[in-house]
Amino acid sequence: VAVRNIFPAPGLDPDHPREPPMQIQPMISTHPDVRGSVNDSLIRAIEAGYGCAAVCRICADACLAEEMVRDLTQCIRLDLDCADVCLATAGLAVRRAGSNEALIKRMLETCAEACADCAIEGEKHAEMHEHCRICAEECRRCEDACREAAASIRPSRH
């Protein structure tokens, strides 16, 4: 019995050549408090955060299925921590209109650190576990996006 890969690489599934883009940018740009002025680096960080959270959760689950699961305990913990931080950061950032920019900046910086920690751990297992390699790469992408977005935010003083 042939097993179909339900998680094909993006663009490689002939039935779904490309995933539709997230609708975050159009949604935020229509917000009455934003009026079309969108921080593109923040949008990239939001999308990267949601994507990284999913990849980290999948990696943690894949690690749990490995025979040597005890050797992957720290990797699993960091995957789950990273996923939670990414979700919290993205969730806060999508509500950025009228919110605390200083807090968003700190969350983005924290998310970048969580992603860096997770990537370092995943890279230790990357040669033996493909899911750890993929996760580490996704964490690095999210880390970069969060650092770029954090640098773009200049909180106003009240």
Describe every region a protein language model picked out.
Residues 21-158:
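Amphipathic alpha-helical hairpins
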